[in-house]
């Protein structure tokens, strides 16, 4: 009988209008299974979030701010052309292409963009540009390349920060229309906030005074004879400006005539200041961080200084993200012959966007997490580690699924709203997952995982077949090469063979087809195992998107089926049970009534023999 009620609790959803209505039934089912010592009872709850945009985050330690690299995504746009052009190979364009000569024309947008990059960095107008175009990796003689296919937009939009972050960065524009708002963290979640101020000033340059453009300016058809104007660099705003001299980076700076854009600092010392911060898990021992406001570089005192030019730090990428423009001064003559020399026309714009290049680290801005910050981002952000909303609970604790949650409405008033955010799985509760009724998510999840396993198995088989085909092509090509080699040896036999004739080292092909075929065979075996494992699962009908809508109705239908099938038996048993109980009750009542009458009233015993009629008393 207990099993029947357990089945009813699992199958029958009490209300189809509210998706959280089955949560109390799950708790009740769990308690019944525990009290009856059922084999379906589990000692653990596994609670997952049903909202794909929801996650939890913990603040990253201060060492992440110094050691986490970032990648640059650089695009530019020019006046004569519409759209943006991506510079995807800065190394090749800057090392091999040198437009700063008199023989080059600058109608090509790529040439103009690279020329401006060289011009800005070589003249020192924008000192930070050196770090953007000449970063060298350690132990590698190559330059930094811009990030390919960055992931724009937020990854999660409902991220909750569990504790206070040691460091935050803030940036706001005076004109909000020019900015892309990413989110705003409250002041209580930030131990210290660095304020980045976008540049509102510009710097002018007369090309005739630059050494690199002197030869180009002598040509009659030379371009850019008019003065240029550049966007200025951003700056840091400090609440406690306590500066001290700090050494500049000249050890890893390389300057050569072939790379004039790699401008090295002239002064051996710059200006820095210290911050006293606290780690997220240690609020008793402060940590001192040194900040270089010129290059937007941070360093923890007592820690080894990271390679200065190996990567951009998060503060560097956040500060330099933006759009920087170049204008040309056009001197015009008005009708009254007055000369107007203060009109600048837009020539070219650079857009710098940076992406985190370390797995597991994200920018948290408000409640949204990002890998790449937009060029003109605006808001308050910090670095975090994030993880999904998963909880493990013991068997003696009720699933914490609130039927009501307080959410912020449009009129900024907290009001209760039905919002279940946890999805409990009963580990070992085979009835719910096997039948897939009442709880549509379990059946849908099983179907999706089955389809995913099938697709993965087919993909592995295709990869194995492709590898085998490529190996067969290589084997046939090797056979052709060996035939040609033998023919060449016969032709050049009089001169000692092909190698002696070419005066080169003899090279031979080492056939490793056995290793490749073994790898392909292992892939096929894994695909076969996945296929068998997928076939062993319950074969659900391929209803696609209709399955989540159909499964909630299966519970009531099955309940009605069981009721119609066993209803007559149950009614017969119930009638017989009531009749028996009624008969026993009537008999007991009548017996008690008779006994009571006999005890309360006295009756005389009738004589056994009747008196003699002819006997007359005297």
Curated annotation (Swiss-Prot):
Disruption phenotype: Viable, although growth is retarded and neonate numbers are reduced. In the placental labyrinth, formation of syncytiotrophoblast layer II (SynT-II) is abnormal with reduced cell fusion and progressive expansion of maternal blood lacunae. Unfused SynT-II cells form dense plaque-like structures between adjacent cells, which resemble cell junctions and are associated with high expression levels of GJB6/connexin-30. Formation of syncytiotrophoblast layer I (SynT-I) is grossly normal.
UniProt name for this protein: Syncytin-B
Disulphide bridges: 44-47, 44-507, 499-506
Keywords for the protein's UniProt record, in alphabetical order: Cell membrane, Developmental protein, Disulfide bond, ERV, Glycoprotein, Membrane, Signal, Transmembrane, Transmembrane helix
Annotated site location: Cleavage: 418-419
Region spans: Immunosuppression: 482-498
Record text on subunit structure and interactions: The mature protein consists of a trimer of SU-TM heterodimers. The SU-TM heterodimers are attached by a labile interchain disulfide bond.
Tissue: Highly expressed in placenta where it localizes to syncytiotrophoblasts of the labyrinthine zona. Specifically localizes to syncytiotrophoblast layer II (SynT-II). Also detected at very low levels in ovary.
Extracellular side, ranges: 18-545
TM region positions: 546-566
Miscellaneous section: The mouse genome contains a high percentage of proviral-like elements, also called endogenous retroviruses (ERVs) that are the genomic traces of ancient infections of the germline by exogenous retroviruses. Although most of these elements are defective, some have conserved a functional envelope (env) gene, most probably diverted by the host for its benefit.
Ranges spanned by the short sequence motif CX6CC, renumbered to the chain: 499-507
Signals that turn on the gene: In males, up-regulated in regenerating muscle tissue after injury.
Domain of life according to the entry: Eukaryota
Sequence segments annotated as region (Fusion peptide): 422-442
Residues exposed to the Cytoplasmic side: 567-618
Gene Ontology CC terms: plasma membrane
Signal peptide: 1-17
Phosphoprotein as UniProt keyword: no
Family statement: Belongs to the gamma type-C retroviral envelope protein family.
Carbohydrate-modified residues: 27, 184, 274, 357
Functional note: This endogenous retroviral envelope protein has retained its original fusogenic properties. Together with Syna, participates in trophoblast fusion and the formation of a syncytium during placenta morphogenesis. Synb is specifically involved in formation of syncytiotrophoblast layer II (SynT-II). Promotes myoblast fusion, and may play a role in regeneration of damaged muscle tissue in males. May have immunosuppressive activity.
Source organism per UniProt: Mus musculus (Mouse)
Annotated GO biological process: labyrinthine layer blood vessel development; myoblast fusion; myoblast fusion involved in skeletal muscle regeneration; skeletal muscle tissue development; syncytium formation by plasma membrane fusion
CDD domains xrefs: HTLV-1-like_HR1-HR2 (cd09851)
Record-linked Pfam families: TLV_coat
């Amino acid at each position: 009988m207990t099993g029947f009620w357990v089945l009813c609790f699992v199958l029958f959803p009490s209300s189809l209008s509210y998706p959280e209505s089955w949560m109390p039934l799950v708790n009740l089912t769990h308690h019944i299974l525990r009290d009856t010592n059922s084999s379906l009872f589990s000692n653990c709850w596994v609670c997952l979030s049903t909202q794909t945009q929801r996650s939890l985050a913990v603040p990253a330690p201060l060492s992440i701010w110094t050691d986490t690299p970032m990648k640059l995504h650089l695009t530019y746009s020019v006046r004569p052309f519409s759209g943006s052009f991506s510079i995807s190979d800065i190394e090749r364009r800057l090392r091999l292409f040198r437009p700063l000569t008199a023989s080059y024309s600058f109608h090509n947008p790529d040439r103009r963009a690279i020329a401006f990059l060289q011009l800005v960095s070589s003249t020192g107008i924008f000192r930070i540009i050196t770090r953007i175009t000449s970063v060298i990796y350690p132990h590698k003689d190559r330059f930094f390349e811009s990030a390919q296919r960055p992931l724009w937009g937020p990854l999660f939009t409902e991220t909750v920060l569990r504790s206070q972050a040691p460091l935050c960065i803030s940036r706001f524009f005076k004109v909000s229309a020019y900015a892309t708002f990413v989110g705003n963290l409250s002041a209580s979640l930030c131990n210290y906030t660095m304020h980045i101020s976008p540049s509102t000033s510009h710097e002018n340059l007369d090309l005739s005074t630059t050494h690199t453009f002197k030869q180009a300016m002598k040509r009659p058809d030379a371009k850019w004879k008019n003065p240029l104007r550049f966007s200025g660099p951003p700056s840091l705003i400090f609440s406690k400006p306590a500066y001290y001299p700090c050494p500049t980076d000249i050890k890893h700076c390389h300057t050569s005539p072939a790379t004039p854009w790699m401008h090295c600092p002239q002064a051996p010392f710059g200006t820095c200041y210290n911050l006293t911060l606290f780690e997220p898990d240690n609020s008793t021992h402060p940590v001192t961080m040194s900040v270089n406001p010129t290059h937007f570089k941070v360093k923890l005192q007592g820690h080894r200084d990271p390679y200065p030019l190996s990567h951009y730090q998060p503060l560097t990428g956040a500060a330099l993200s933006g759009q920087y423009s170049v204008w040309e001064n056009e001197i015009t003559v008005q009708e009254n012959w007055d000369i107007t020399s203060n009109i600048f026309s837009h020539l070219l714009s650079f857009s710098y966007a940076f992406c985190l290049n370390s797995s597991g680290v994200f920018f948290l801005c408000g409640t949204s997490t990002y890998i790449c910050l937009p060029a003109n981002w605006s808001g308050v952000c910090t670095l975090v580690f994030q993880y999904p909303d998963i909880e493990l609970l013991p068997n003696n604790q009720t699933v914490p699924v609130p039927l009501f949650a307080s959410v912020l409405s449009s009129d900024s008033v907290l009001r209760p709203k039905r919002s279940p955010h946890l999805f409990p799985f009963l580990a070992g509760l085979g009835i719910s997952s096997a039948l897939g009724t009442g709880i549509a998510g379990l059946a849908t999840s099983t179907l999706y995982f089955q389809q995913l396993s099938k697709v993965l198995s087919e993909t592995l088989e295709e990869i194995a077949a492709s590898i085998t085909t490529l190996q067969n092509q290589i084997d046939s090509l090797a056979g052709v090469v060996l035939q040609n080699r033998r023919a060449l040896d016969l032709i050049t036999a009089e001169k000692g063979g092909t190698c002696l004739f070419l005066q080169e080292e003899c090279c031979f092909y080492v056939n490793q087809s056995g290793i490749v075929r073994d790898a392909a065979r292992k892939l096929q075996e894994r695909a076969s195992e996945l296929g068998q494992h997928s076939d062993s699962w319950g074969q659900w009908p391929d209803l696609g998107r209709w399955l989540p809508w159909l499964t909630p109705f299966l519970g009531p239908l099955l309940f009605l089926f069981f009721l119609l099938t066993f209803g007559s038996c149950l009614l017969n048993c119930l009638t017989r049970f009531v009749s028996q109980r009624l008969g026993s009750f009537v008999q007991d009542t009548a017996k008690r009534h008779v006994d009571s009458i006999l005890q309360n009233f006295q009756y005389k015993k009738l004589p056994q023999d009747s008196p003699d009629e002819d006997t007359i008393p005297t």
